[in-house]
């Protein structure tokens, strides 16, 4: 094959692993990636919801997995590489809001569960992705962690969730630093008030609790627009990295959450 023929070959599609792909931002992002030509590995605990996200696409691979279980995570990434040969992007999206209430009312079980999903699960998936990204040829890849506005400023009575999202920020920075020699980048998207079931559950239909003790219905924006921001980060050239991106609904309370 001559050089001219090689230069006109179409590069293979990129492969992305998306956790929490059965609903909300994860589902919207998976569909955006599929529309953009990615091969997408859909991970989550509920297979039926993952299949609904995939909608029969031949470029989608459904892998039911609990990101808090190390063996599930290893199986997820082995399945991704087995099906598509490599991992170019990980969107660490799965998370839980956890319990609400004053920290003195927070049980150790609820605290540990929130950390297990939002921090340990994120770490386990990143670690598995990095191992494969180091080993593959060409080496490298991109990790995008889903943080939150709570990584900047908390909602009232959300100590566990807020602590985990600050931890994700630290993890993002460490992964990005340590990945440099291997062509692995890591960035974080902090999304405020995308219209998802998680957002709808805040306040139990009575509006979100504000810093002054009142409740108010807050602005929201479509999950598909959040997904477009994730796709923007994932589509950056290998020479660039979007380290941090904050995307909120226009008019959403931010500083002091009031």
Predicted regions mapped to residue ranges:
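C-terminal helical subdomain
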Residues: 184, 188-189, 208-255
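Active-site helix of classical SDR
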Residues: 126, 164
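Conserved glycine-rich Rossmann-like NAD(P)H-binding loop of the short-chain dehydrogenase/reductase
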Residues: 36-51
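Residue(s) in the substrate-gating loop at a strand-loop-helix junction
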Residues: 148
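Substrate-binding pocket helix/loop in short-chain dehydrogenase/reductase
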Residues: 101-103, 110-112
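The beta1-alpha1 cofactor-binding region of Rossmann-like NAD(H)/NADP(H)-dependent oxidoreductases
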Residues: 65-76, 108
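Conserved glycine-rich cofactor-binding loop
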Residues: 22-24
């Amino acid at each position: 094959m001559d050089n001219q023929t090689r230069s006109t070959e179409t590069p293979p599609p990129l492969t992305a692993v998306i956790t929490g792909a059965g609903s909300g931002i994860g589902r919207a992002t998976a569909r955006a990636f599929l529309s953009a030509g990615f091969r997408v590995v859909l991970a989550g605990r509920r297979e039926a919801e993952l299949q609904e996200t995939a909608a029969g696409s031949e470029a989608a691979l459904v892998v039911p997995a609990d990101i808090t279980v190390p063996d599930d995570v290893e199986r997820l990434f082995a399945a991704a590489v087995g099906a598509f040969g490599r991992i170019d992007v990980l969107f660490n999206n799965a998370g839980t809001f956890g319990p609400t209430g004053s920290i003195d009312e927070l049980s150790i079980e609820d605290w540990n569960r929130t950390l297990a999903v939002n921090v340990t699960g994120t770490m386990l998936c990143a670690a598995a992705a990095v191992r494969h990204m180091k080993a593959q040829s060409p080496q490298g890849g991109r990790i995008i962690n889903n943080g939150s506005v709570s990584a900047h400023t908390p909602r009232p009575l959300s100590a566990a969730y807020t602590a985990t999202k600050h931890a994700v920020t630290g993890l993002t920075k460490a992964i990005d630093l340590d990945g440099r020699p291997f062509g692995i980048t890591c960035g974080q998207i902090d999304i405020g008030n995308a219209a998802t079931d998680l957002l709808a559950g805040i306040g139990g239909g009575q509006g979100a609790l504000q810093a002054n003790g009142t409740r108010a219905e807050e602005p929201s924006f479509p999950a598909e627009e959040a997904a477009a921001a994730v796709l923007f980060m994932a589509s950056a050239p290998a020479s660039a990295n979007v380290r941090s991106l904050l995307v909120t609904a226009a008019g959403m309370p931010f500083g002091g959450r009031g």
